[in-house]
């Protein structure tokens, strides 16, 4: 009887530890907003004025067409980075790089690897909170080109629809680290196999203000392609040490990474310059692709980012954000992985050497 009670007690302890790990969260949390706030327009002339009249802002704000009719609630839906259960980080290595590595003062992955056209793509997540999936899929697509010399676009839809609860809640938000883990154990098909657009040419949420998470089909839209053969994998998942030198070294050596940050109301108004938070409430967490860095003419160090709100937002779809101060938590948790050669037929470049950055 005593042995049975001991086993029962141990089982209870392990169950409790499991629950604590499952619900112990890490990451970005949004403010609790009132219904009145959620129903108000996200774009405000007052915010534009406050930013543009601030001599120390370092960036310009505007009422851009992308969110001209959107409420705060509709804008918030796009911010799909959820606080991540800490269990997802168990066993995930934190990568650092040789501090003596000499890095350029400015770097842009688009020009470093000009053969990789995917790096410069600006996509549109529509009305779905799928930023966590876009940041991951776009970065891995770029890394396949950098590593293997092949331009491919991987499928956001596969990750969004088929990863399930492990990755979060699909269009209602997810976990960037879990997206990269999905690449390792399940792989992700190409955009050609499982596109993010339906047969009417409407982006998955483009037609509806609250598009539901698509269903996982595990079948290519073209009968000429097999789902299993279209899968592309990563061989590792890791976070990058949270300091500018290591983040720069990772991008310089391996290509773009996925980063997350806290979005405030003023960010919706970004037009140009080096963003830093000036005014407005914390709306939620957003994930994007980090493709480079530099220093502005005013002497402000910045990260160069590719967003997925189409080219009508920001600076032709891109934005710069202050570097070295962990602005809005941007340097907290860069996530990445290395592409696998499984299912890949390497492009013959006439050399056994891997492509490297040209700077």
From Swiss-Prot:
Keyword Hydrolase part of the UniProt annotation: yes
Keywords: Disulfide bond, Glycoprotein, Hydrolase, Plant defense, Protease, Signal, Thiol protease, Vacuole
Enzyme Commission numbers on file: 3.4.22.-
UniProt-annotated location(s): Vacuole
The species this protein was found in: Arabidopsis thaliana (Mouse-ear cress)
Induction info: By dark-induced senescence. Induced by infection with an avirulent strain of the bacterial pathogen Pseudomonase syringae pv. tomato DC3000.
Keyword Signal appears in the UniProt entry: yes
InterPro entries attached to this UniProt entry: Papain-like_cys_pep_sf, Pept_cys_AS, Pept_his_AS, Peptidase_C1A, Peptidase_C1A_C, Propeptide_C1A
GO biological process: defense response; proteolysis
Positions annotated as active site in the UniProt record: 131, 286, 307
Glycosylation sites: 69, 151
Primary localisation category: other
One MF term in the entry's GO annotations: cysteine-type endopeptidase activity
Tissues with expression: Expressed in root tips, root vasculature, emerging lateral root, hydathodes, vascular tissue of leaves, vasculature of sepals and anthers, stigma, and vascular bundles at the base and the upper part of the siliques.
Disruption phenotype: Delayed germination and decreased germination rate.
Residue ranges the record assigns to the propeptide: 27-102, 343-359
Function comment: Thiol protease that possesses high activity toward the cathepsin synthetic substrate Arg-Arg-7-amino-4-methylcoumarin (RR-AMC) and the papain substrate Gly-Arg-Arg-AMC (GRR-AMC). Can cleave the papain substrate Phe-Arg-AMC (FR-AMC) and the caspase-3 substrate Asp-Glu-Val-Asp-rhodamine 110 (DEVD-R110). Has no activity towards the caspase-6 substrate VEID-AMC, caspase-8 substrate IETD-AMC and caspase-1 substrate YVAD-AMC. Plays a central role in plant programmed cell death (PCD).
Signal peptide as annotated in the record: 1-26
Enzyme class: hydrolase
Regulation: Inhibited by the cathepsin B inhibitors Ac-LVK-CHO, CA-074 and Z-FA-FMK, and the caspase-3 inhibitor Z-DEVD-CHO.
Designated name of the protein: Cathepsin B-like protease 3
UniProt GO cellular component terms: plant-type vacuole; secretory vesicle
